[in-house]
Amino acid sequence: MSKITKKVEELVKPILERYGFDLVDIEFKKEGKSHFLRVYIDKPGGITIDDCQLVSEELSEKLDIVDPIPFSYYLEVSSPGVDRPLVTDRDFIRNKGKVVDVFLNQPFLNRTRITGELVEKNEKSLILIVDKEKIVIPIENIKKVKLAIRF
């Protein structure tokens, strides 16, 4: 985490805590000639545009005072989107009981992608229900976990 994203995290966390929102991620990157500061937030039941606007306005005020970025940039506050990977313990807790896609580094049960109901994630493994059977996948073999999108 860069100095800028650490400072932004310090500034945004009290705002999010006040409203019961979760910080998912902070990105600061250059795209073309412009710099973007992106703050991804969530809450149980999902984040709304009004929630994003509220956080954006309050964070913008704090950023103007502290001024951790010495050049112009665009501030974007948004939901993480349905296709983002589950990363934090809070992500896994929030999505317990939902169907996830697990992408693996090495084949497990002859597959590199396993879809199943999320039961639990701990320090050593991810536990799923697949075809009514409990399977335990070692954490070190997991490349990425995302919510399964059903059409």
From Swiss-Prot:
GO biological process entries: ribosomal small subunit assembly; translation
Listed Gene3D superfamilies: Ribosome maturation factor RimP, C-terminal domain, RimP-like superfamily, N-terminal
A Pfam short name: DUF150_C
Organism annotation: Caldicellulosiruptor bescii (strain ATCC BAA-1888 / DSM 6725 / KCTC 15123 / Z-1320) (Anaerocellum thermophilum)
Matches recorded under HAMAP family: RimP
Protein known as: Ribosome maturation factor RimP
Keywords: Cytoplasm, Ribosome biogenesis
Assigned protein family: Belongs to the RimP family.
SUPFAM superfamilies noted in UniProt: YhbC-like, C-terminal domain, YhbC-like, N-terminal domain
Function: Required for maturation of 30S ribosomal subunits.
Highest rank taxon of the organism: Bacteria
Subcellular location per the Swiss-Prot or TrEMBL entry: Cytoplasm
GO CC entries: cytosol
